[in-house]
């Protein structure tokens, strides 16, 4: 280990910045955020930097640096663009063992500034020891995207109840279990969702009952159309903390691999004319697993509230007062259309869009076909592969032009994506014998004309 990470308490402590430009200002923002009293020495000082110094009750010296400015400060940052000045500042600090950071010159530093993830009071520093600062910033960016912004509030909540938890749970093991349940369960999710009052009430109730019983919860998460990069941050976070995963056929393997390695996986997939697990049984499984105190992930392709029967699955949970969350996913219409270069609405072609289930009940159609013939409307049929011929012929029968452009998108957003473009009269014949497999999405309307020009995902 080249450096030992330490955290510096700078509240009301005098710190010196040598330099007055953009880099010096950037460093001053960090020190000011940490509560430092800022002193700046430089012939020219930016307006923002002067304001930061004034806000910290420090002083600005518009002159050249000399060693006397090191008196009574506890940290020095040299941020000039003159190498000779930076070298002198570093040498002066080393001589009196005063911590110094010289920007972009690790060899001159006695301390280095990490890339920072600030979720105060939770603070994370990432450094490459000055060897690869761009890489350190890249790692910081990855952490920023995976650590919810409200983690700071969660840490503050834990601090607020820390002493009381010690008083209630004198046994260290019980106290640890209590905090594990708090920080990994529904109470933490209340905080992350912005409901601090409800979180405090739940903690109060557990402390009043001196209970460490684990509370179950269900996460109804939309996995999107297939590409793992289309997952939301919240979806990924819940996927990685669930202990049991119930998933269906439309969840792609790369997305399934992003769940916890040790999570129990239960396949409840559905195919046309075949239900691996009946819907009512799925609902009951979610309830029973949550009642066992488990964190349960119901992972569904697309969006759970668009042809996903998500409302049915959480209805039983609500009746039994089981905590649950619903995380929307990018629905197939949005994802597949975007990856096919087909805008669902377009100033020249379509002023509205309609989502329709293409899953014909027992092979029969019960739609109001006359509502679908408007030329300025885009039609999107989900699960329409088996009923494709019926859908196309019925639209033509009720007045839709046989030459209306139509596209059948197969395995949209995935590397195997194929887009079959024709018109209402010819699409069914075009895909005959092509070994097309679900999941598919059918888009009908003049917006399909954009595919040839805008198709970027090839």
From Swiss-Prot:
NAD(+) binds at residues 22-23, 43-44. It catalyses: uroporphyrinogen III + 2 S-adenosyl-L-methionine = precorrin-2 + 2 S-adenosyl-L-homocysteine + H(+); precorrin-2 + NAD(+) = sirohydrochlorin + NADH + 2 H(+); siroheme + 2 H(+) = sirohydrochlorin + Fe(2+). Residues 1-203 are annotated as: Precorrin-2 dehydrogenase /sirohydrochlorin ferrochelatase. Pathway: Cofactor biosynthesis; adenosylcobalamin biosynthesis; precorrin-2 from uroporphyrinogen III: step 1/1; Cofactor biosynthesis; adenosylcobalamin biosynthesis; sirohydrochlorin from precorrin-2: step 1/1; Porphyrin-containing compound metabolism; siroheme biosynthesis; precorrin-2 from uroporphyrinogen III: step 1/1; Porphyrin-containing compound metabolism; siroheme biosynthesis; siroheme from sirohydrochlorin: step 1/1. PANTHER family: SIROHEME SYNTHASE, SIROHEME SYNTHASE-RELATED. In the N-terminal section; belongs to the precorrin-2 dehydrogenase / sirohydrochlorin ferrochelatase family. In the C-terminal section; belongs to the precorrin methyltransferase family. This is Siroheme synthase. It comes from Saccharophagus degradans (strain 2-40 / ATCC 43961 / DSM 17024). The lineage of its organism: Bacteria, Pseudomonadati, Pseudomonadota, Gammaproteobacteria, Cellvibrionales. The gene is cysG.
């Amino acid at each position: 280990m080249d450096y030992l990470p330490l955290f510096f308490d700078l509240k009301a402590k005098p710190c010196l910045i040598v330099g007055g430009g953009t880099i010096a200002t950037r460093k001053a923002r960090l020190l000011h955020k940490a509560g430092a009293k800022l002193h700046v020495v430089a012939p020219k000082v930016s307006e923002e930097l002067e304001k930061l110094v004034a806000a910290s009750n420090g002083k600005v010296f518009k002159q050249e640096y000399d060693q006397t400015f090191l008196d009574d400060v506890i940290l020095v940052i040299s941020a000039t663009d003159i190498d000779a000045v930076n070298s002198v500042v570093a040498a002066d600090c080393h001589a009196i063992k005063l911590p110094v950071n010289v920007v972009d010159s690790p060899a001159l530093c006695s301390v280095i500034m990490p890339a920072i993830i600030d979720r105060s009071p939770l603070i994370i520093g990432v450094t490459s020891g000055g060897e690869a600062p761009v890489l350190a910033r890249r790692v910081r960016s990855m952490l920023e995207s995976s650590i919810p912004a409200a983690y700071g509030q969660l840490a503050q909540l834990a601090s607020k109840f820390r002493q009381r938890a010690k008083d209630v749970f004198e046994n260290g093991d019980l106290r640890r279990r209590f905090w594990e349940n708090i920080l990994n369960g529904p109470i933490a999710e209340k905080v992350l969702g912005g409901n601090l009052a409800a979180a405090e009430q739940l903690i109060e109730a557990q402390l009043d009952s001196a209970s460490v019983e684990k509370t179950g919860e269900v996460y109804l998460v939309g996995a999107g159309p297939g590409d793992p990069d289309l997952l939301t941050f919240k979806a990924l976070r819940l996927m990685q903390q669930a202990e049991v995963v119930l998933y269906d056929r439309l969840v792609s393997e790369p997305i399934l691999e992003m769940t916890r390695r040790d999570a129990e996986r239960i396949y409840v997939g559905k195919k046309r004319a075949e239900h691996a697990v009946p819907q009512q049984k799925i609902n009951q499984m979610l309830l029973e697993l949550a009642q066992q105190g488990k964190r349960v992930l119901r992972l569904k392709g697309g969006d759970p509230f668009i042809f996903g029967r998500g409302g049915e699955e959480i209805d039983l949970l609500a009746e039994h007062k089981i905590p649950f969350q619903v995380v929307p996913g990018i629905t197939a219409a949005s994802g597949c259309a975007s990856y096919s270069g087909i805008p669902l609405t377009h100033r020249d072609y379509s002023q509205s869009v309609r989502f329709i289930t293409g899953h014909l009940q027992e092979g029969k159609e019960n739609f109001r076909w006359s509502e679908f013939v408007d030329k300025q409307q885009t039609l999107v049929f989900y699960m329409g592969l088996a009923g494709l011929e019926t859908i196309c012929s019925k639209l033509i029968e009720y007045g839709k032009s046989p030459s209306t452009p139509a596209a059948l998108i197969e395995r949209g957003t995935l590397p195997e994506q194929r887009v079959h473009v024709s018109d209402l009269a010819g699409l069914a014949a075009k895909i005959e014998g092509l070994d097309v497999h679900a999941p598919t999405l059918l888009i009908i309307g003049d917006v399909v004309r954009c595919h040839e020009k805008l198709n970027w995902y090839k």
